[in-house]
Amino acid sequence: MLVVEVANGRSLVWGAEAVQALRERLGVGGRTVGALPRGPRQNSRLGLPLLLLPEEARLLAEIGAVTLVSAPRPDPRNHGLALASFKRQQEQSFQDQNTLAAEARETRRQELLEKIVEGQAAKKQKLEQDSGADEGGQEAGGSEATQGSETSDDGQPSAEQEGAAPSLDSSSPQPGPSNGVTPLPRSALLIQLATARPRPVKAKPLDWRVQSKDWPHAGRPAHELRYSIYRDLWERGFFLSAAGKFGGDFLVYPGDPLRFHAHYIAQCWSAEDPIPLQDLVSAGRLGTSVRKTLLLCSPQPDGKVVYTSLQWASLQ
């Protein structure tokens, strides 16, 4: 089961796989609020953690898809231990990378060893052929005299000939085991970036039915109103997100927000609350100007939700 950490009314999802599962299987997108490690000074693209609306977190808890837990408060006395643990893990990662790099280089060297030996043999054979061709062009008498001086009476090669052979072999590189592998510089090593945070050991389950410091939404009329509408739209197959900058409660999408634009700006109104005409006109004009339809949502005592769509039509 997925885990959602709740602290001070904010519901956070820290795992990348959990975020993917919420979007693909449950139709809950949330909003990323974390800075990217390689782009911390911008806010156009954000990363983990994922911030859920209170209505999203409650819905997931009600259907049994997630477990809400209260995140433990950080203890400043443990910061030094956490930093030391992080540095140990980083050093271990660097050592593992150097070990893998050395193994890869040794494997590559073994693959090329046969080609190196063949190349050395071909080079040696070519030098011997060139030397034989030069000697064949000399006079027969001179060749016999030279041959007689290089060999002794018993047919053994002379000391000069013995010394020439190893000098030929030493002129070309000899394949053999490496005496050692130079470690990679720190600038060439990769720094592992965590994509998830382990579940806190001391985390305790959170009851969303009871109001607490971490979950102050329980029992609030505004939250109950928004939740009833959110769940009804979600059960109809819509994706929803926050719509604060559009003057509404939710943006309603026909599918994944990564593929579709929002079609509606949902405003939640209680059935007995009057709607000021000025707010109604301004919301309708705003929705039309951004090519969206204003959706007035009001839950009824029998549990059903009444929807009224509104578009502003200018005078012709």
From Swiss-Prot:
Catalysed conversion reaction: pretRNA = a 3'-half-tRNA molecule with a 5'-OH end + a 5'-half-tRNA molecule with a 2',3'-cyclic phosphate end + an intron with a 2',3'-cyclic phosphate and a 5'-hydroxyl terminus
Disulfide-bond pairs as recorded: none
Bias (Polar residues) ranges: 144-159, 168-181
Principal subcellular localization: nucleus
Example GO biological process: mRNA processing
Enzyme Commission number(s): 4.6.1.16
Cross-referenced SUPFAM superfamilies: tRNA-intron endonuclease catalytic domain-like
An example Gene Ontology CC term for this record: nucleolus
Location within or outside the cell: Nucleus; Nucleus, Nucleolus
Active site (record annotation): Y253, H261, K292
Pfam families attached to this UniProt entry: tRNA_int_endo (PF01974)
Superkingdom: Eukaryota
Matches recorded under NCBIfam families: endA
Record function comment: Constitutes one of the two catalytic subunit of the tRNA-splicing endonuclease complex, a complex responsible for identification and cleavage of the splice sites in pre-tRNA. It cleaves pre-tRNA at the 5'- and 3'-splice sites to release the intron. The products are an intron and two tRNA half-molecules bearing 2',3'-cyclic phosphate and 5'-OH termini. There are no conserved sequences at the splice sites, but the intron is invariably located at the same site in the gene, placing the splice sites an invariant distance from the constant structural features of the tRNA body.
Quaternary structure annotation from Swiss-Prot or TrEMBL: tRNA splicing endonuclease is a heterotetramer composed of TSEN2, TSEN15, TSEN34/LENG5 and TSEN54. tRNA splicing endonuclease complex also contains proteins of the pre-mRNA 3'-end processing machinery such as CLP1, CPSF1, CPSF4 and CSTF2.
Entry's family note: Belongs to the tRNA-intron endonuclease family.
Protein name in UniProt: tRNA-splicing endonuclease subunit Sen34
Organism: Mus musculus
Gene (name only): Tsen34
